[in-house]
Design a protein with these regions (language model features):
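Catalytic beta/alpha-barrel core
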Residues: 73-74, 88-102, 111-124, 135-146, ...
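N-terminal amphipathic alpha-helix/helix-capping segment at the start of soluble metabolic enzymes
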Residues: 1-22, 271-277
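Structural preference for beta-strand elements that scaffold enzyme active sites
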Residues: 19-23, 52-56, 92-94, 111-112, ...
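Glycine-rich, proline-tolerant flexible connector loops at the mouths of alpha/beta enzymes
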Residues: 22-35, 53-75, 240-249
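Catalytic alpha/beta core domains of metabolic enzymes, predominantly
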Residues: 133, 137-239
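A cross-domain feature marking catalytic cores of carbohydrate-active enzymes
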Residues: 26, 55-59, 95-97, 117, ...
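Active-site-adjacent loop and "lid" segments of alpha/beta metabolic enzymes
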Residues: 67-76, 112-119, 175-179, 203-228, ...
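Alpha-helix-loop-beta-strand connector modules within alpha/beta enzyme cores
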Residues: 42-44, 48-49, 68-94, 129-135, ...
Length: 277
């Protein structure tokens, strides 16, 4: 794996292992215990497998289909929990923002600022994120061609920040499905920035009549293995001790006790591919 600017991210370990990196954690901060327990378990696994690990969890979910859907436990409370994760476990943390004001606020708590897929073309949001000086992870919109992501990245660069990641999270395939075009990974890597594959949101089943997004978590391994096969730099995966009881995106997340076996297989696949290359 090319180090890019990743070596500049505080507490991002195992970069010399040759492995992909992962961004992993529960969809949203539900409480301190679930957040801490999940971070601790993922750290244990990634240290064993020598995988660079960035903890991910949203401090608030702004994009909900129904007005009564769970959005969070309170911004300040959630951000303080994320900061505690970074300090206690000595790992970098990423969370997403939804407007310019949140860029400045979240940058005081996390190492990486994430731009949601639906907001990937919002110029003022990208500029605000860039000006924090934090790494900016831009998720490719389900409606955006991979070649067009160079322009989103350039907005960050032209704002004085060259620390950009791009994330593939699927493309609309009709009204109620997404599909991963693995050519997107290759196309976005042409920008020179690290490219991540979101293996959980790529399996969403949107626009359900219930108003709650569905998913196909049984295919997470398939999507992830294909991503490793084409040479993706990082894997984004949401995981939870009990997805059935999760307050957001439970239908998409991988059960935490399945994570080690999945990552073990991905590392083995990565090593095999590197031998041939």
């Amino acid at each position: 794996m090319k180090n890019f600017f990743l070596s500049q991210i505080e507490n991002l370990h195992n970069l010399d292992s040759g492995n992909f990196f992962i961004m992993a954690g529960p969809c949203v901060v539900e409480n301190e215990k679930i957040t801490f327990d999940t971070a601790e378990k993922i750290l244990e696994i990634t240290e064993k497998l020598k995988i660079p690990f960035i903890f991910k969890s949203s401090f608030r979910k702004a994009n909900r289909q129904k007005i009564d859907s769970f959005t969070g436990i309170g911004d300040e409370k959630a951000l303080k929990i994320l900061r505690s994760v970074a300090e206690i476990y000595e790992i970098p943390v990423v969370t997403d923002i939804h407007n310019q004001e949140e860029a400045c606020i979240t940058s005081q708590y996390v190492d990486i600022i994430q731009i949601p897929a639906f907001l990937c073309r919002q110029t003022e949001l990208l500029v605000a994120a860039a000006k924090t000086g934090r790494v900016v992870n831009i998720k490719k919109g389900q409606f955006v061609a991979p070649e067009s992501m160079q322009f989103a990245a350039q907005k960050v660069v032209d704002s004085g920040n060259k620390k950009v990641m791009l994330t593939e999270r699927g493309t609309m395939f009709g009204y109620q499905d997404l599909i991963v075009d693995y050519r997107s990974i290759i196309e976005m890597q042409k920008t020179g920035f690290p490219v991540v594959l979101d293996v959980t949101h790529s399996l969403q089943i949107p626009n359900q009549q219930s108003g709650v997004t569905g998913g196909k978590p049984d295919l997470i391994g398939t999507i992830a293995r294909a991503g490793i096969a084409v040479g993706v730099d990082g894997i984004f995966i949401e995981t939870h001790p009990n997805p059935a009881e999760a307050k957001s995106d439970g239908a998409n997340m991988l059960k935490l006790d399945l994570l080690e076996s999945l990552l073990t297989r991905l590392v083995q696949l990565r090593q095999t591919i590197l031998k041939f290359n």
